[in-house]
Amino acid sequence: MISGIVAGYQVIDVHVELLDGSSHDVDSNEQAFKMAAIFAMKDAFKNAGCHLLEPIMSVECTTPEQFQGDIMGDLNRRRGRIGEIDGRNNICIIKSEVPLAEMFGYSTDIRTLSSGRASYSMEPSHFEQVPPAIVAKLVEQRGGYGI
């Protein structure tokens, strides 16, 4: 489906099996069957309790110890979860998981927070359900689609 039930985002990786149907010589055509399928799927998704998922990134920041607090605070502000913190020779390595949507502009922000002395890397980790408050905001921004 191109326009899903939650904020209009596309529905992916769903298998649908048609169990029964009927046709009529006058009213049955390809477009009518497509519309019936769309309405049936939207109704099924509403009853199933669909969720919006977002990609979560594994983020590793390397920073001088003096900037550790500022960088951890910034990761928390971005809905990040701090995992391991490792320190050696006045350098901290902060491992965290952060939603991809919150990482835009991070390269500029981490340089600003650390006077250009920190670096980071990130890679895809997994998907998680978007928090309800953010779903509500997305629904509002995208024109009122919602469950």
PLM regions with names:
Residues 1-147:
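Accessory interaction regions appended to the cores of large information-processing enzymes
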